[in-house]
Amino acid sequence: MIARSVRFECDSDEKITLLSAMSACVDLPDKDYEMIDLAGVWARERHVRRHKLDYGIQSIYSMRGCSSYQFNPFLALARENADEFQGQVYGFSLVYSGNFLAQTEVDNYDTARVLMGIHPNRFKWTLGKGESFQTPEMVMVYSEAGLNGMSQTFHKLYLSLIHI
């Protein structure tokens, strides 16, 4: 498990304005993955969508002001042969319930990149001297035990951190 976030600090006498604040950028050495995300509607939440990564940018996002059953701030990259109990899977979860962007990009060198954070549309944050802004954490997990292994890792992590 790896958790990433970014902290912006203003040490200038002049104010600075952030127009984008992504939490993490992760590069993978190849593009041989399928992207899995969870979309849905009322009474049909968390519909699993799975499709092969392709050149260019593929994204999921929400600008509703919160995460919801329509789009969840989560995506996974699974090898084509990965199933519920075997195969390599990377899982990415943004610990945030506001406007978000989660995207993958495949470049002309056949490498894949995952970018996740606060959606830049309608985002603007001004910092004065001595002020800071911390992005929400993006949590990344890896499993060689398929989608169930990834899910169990997330479950154990969040259950150990969240006490009801």
Q: What are these language model-derived features?
A:
Residues 92, 125-144:
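Short Pro-Gly-centered flexible turn/kink motifs
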Residues 16-17, 102-103, 135-136, 143-144, ...:
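Short helix/loop capping segments that flank catalytic or ligand/cofactor-binding pockets
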Residues 111, 159-160:
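Feature activates predominantly on carbohydrate-active enzymes
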Residues 6, 141-154:
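Short, surface-exposed, low-complexity cationic segments
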Residues 162-164:
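Conserved small/polar residues in nucleotide/adenosyl-binding loops
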Residues 88-94, 150-158:
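Short, Φ-rich (hydrophobic/aromatic) sequence segments
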Residues 1-105, 121-123:
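Polysaccharide-binding surfaces and accessory modules of carbohydrate-active proteins
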Residues 111-127:
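Short acidic, Pro/Gly- and aromatic-enriched capping/linker segments at domain boundaries
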